[in-house]
Amino acid sequence: MLRIGLTGGIGAGKSALSSAFAQCGAVIVDGDVIAREVVRPGTEGLAALVEAFGRDILLADGSLDRPALAAKAFADDAARQTLNGIVHPLVGARRAEIIASVPADSVVVEDIPLLVESGMAPLFPLVVIVYADVEVRLRRLVEQRGMAEADARARIAAQASDEQRRAVADIWLDNSGSPAELVQRAQQVWNERIVPFAHNLSTRQIARAPVRLVPPDPEWPAQAQRIVNRLKTASGHRALRVDHVGSTALPGDPDFAAKDVIDIQITVESLAAADELVEPLLAAGYPRLEHITADVAKPDARSTVERYDHTGDPALWHKRIHASADPGRPTNVHIRVDGWPGQQFALLFVDWLTADPDARADYLAVKRSAEQRADGDIDAYVAVKEPWFRDAYRRAWDWADSTGWKP
């Protein structure tokens, strides 16, 4: 099952986008619909709202007077938090019931108005944000929903900012134009990204990126942070730390080209802990690569942990690796044991290359040579680089020893 979190500001067009995805074949779980369901007359949700905000939020027939509740609940932050504290747990429980009832190979789009504000984005393998300019949203709310302009502005101001939404968005769909334009964009995203992603997940396949160096993408840091947040959530207590590593983690050098693949390292206390992550990471969008079980061992393995320093035990280079099923964001997820040489070198390598422009230039030259000689074959690309890495391992640790580096 591929679960997609969908959100956007009030008036941006969440319902329209949900409808477009439903026409494509998605199962829609609408947070607004559920939010109404859990506060119907006779529910514990409505009783809790009355206790918190008073009986004057009820209509004569005992149902919820939504404008009256909104006037109180959006008056200040404390009132809004009270509202969210009552409604969100009930909505979450009902959402879980619905999702548990659908087929396992479904694409489930969860329309959640406050996905960003409630910190739920890392729970989803993919987050879609529908966007419209504030003035466009304001006009829709006033003209189509009959809101007073002051109320509409207050509702907009009470929600997350565009910057906060961008920070969690894997896909950003502009709905400032016509309904037909939004439908076209939704269908394109569905066919080019969502369907392949769902297929890869159901078959436990990964999305492979071309073996091609590209200029640094200014979006890499933000993309990596979203992945880190997602993996921390999926790994829970098993992850001692989660880091952006590899070439895309190097800051500030506009000439340092890299493959368009994000590398992430999850540090765990043991390989047994890594093996407990197979299903949680699959659910998060990252199937395991069963055929890769170790890094290439280096002689005189080094570590800042004394019992692992200057060792020759090849078992200390064992690891687990997962990769993204999302064709829109190829990612490698290396799971290594805390203090083992491979875990330490992944962290050291980024810091060393960041600090040493000559080493950075050397590595770029090796990568360009490997790209040319590999002719699109990832195994050949890795093999061409390996002799350089054997020497780089020693150079990096010489730098670490001279600077007092710690992970």
Curated annotation (Swiss-Prot):
Q: Which residues form the DPCK domain?
A: 3-201
Q: Where does ATP bind?
A: 11-16
GO CC terms in record? cytoplasm
| Any GO molecular function | dephospho-CoA kinase activity
UniProt EC number: 2.7.1.24
The cross-references to Gene3D superfamilies, in alphabetical order and at most eight, read: Beta Polymerase, domain 2 (3.30.460.10), P-loop containing nucleotide triphosphate hydrolases (3.40.50.300)
Cite the entry's keywords alphabetically: ATP-binding, Coenzyme A biosynthesis, Cytoplasm, Kinase, Nucleotide-binding, Transferase
Q: Which GO terms describe its biological process?
A: coenzyme A biosynthetic process
Q: Which residues form the signal peptide?
A: none
UniProt function note: Catalyzes the phosphorylation of the 3'-hydroxyl group of dephosphocoenzyme A to form coenzyme A.
Family the UniProt entry places it in: In the N-terminal section; belongs to the CoaE family.
Protein name as it appears in the record: Dephospho-CoA kinase
